[in-house]
Amino acid sequence: MKTSTGTENRPENVVISQSVAILVDGNNLERAIHDEAGNPHSMLNFDTLIPKLLDNRSLNRLFYFREGRQISSKLKERLHHHYHGSVQPCHKSADIPLTIKAMQLANKVDTIIILSGDSDYVELVRHLKTEGVRVEIAAVTSATSSLLVDESDYFHEVTKDDWFTLPPRPPKRKPDRKQP
């Protein structure tokens, strides 16, 4: 597993000018975080993770792919406001839409970071690398394919420092019905 981006020993006056696209498989990452945290109310903290992933490189695009139509409007607004990102609802799995978007971006960016541990992306990683794109994976280690990690140029481990847990919502009370 590659655990160094190479920036640790870089002289201070050297600036790496890379354009980065981040593609998030929301369902895969959410499920991995919920399993690792043991809590369905745990959520990815983009404000800590995105700067860590970028490592002083420039963010070109951010896409969050998620199955289903029930996507938080707060998440949409936050990603758009802070990262000019967009949320892409998917009919079923995010695999195909994320792959298509990655192929469209391949000649527009230097690096693509895929936030998913799904082995379905192995062939995509291989293809992007043949196109000259640096491909990095960010995921929860326990839910990540070792083959995907081996094929990538770099692996970022998503840890408990990269998510937070919301308190559970209190149950909604039904109004008391007055009897005549």
Predicted segments with their positions:
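Nuclease catalytic cores that cleave nucleic-acid phosphodiester bonds
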Residues: G68-P180
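Domain-level signal for Mg2+-assisted phosphodiester chemistry and nucleotide/NA-binding surfaces
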Residues: K2-I96, Q104-N107, R134
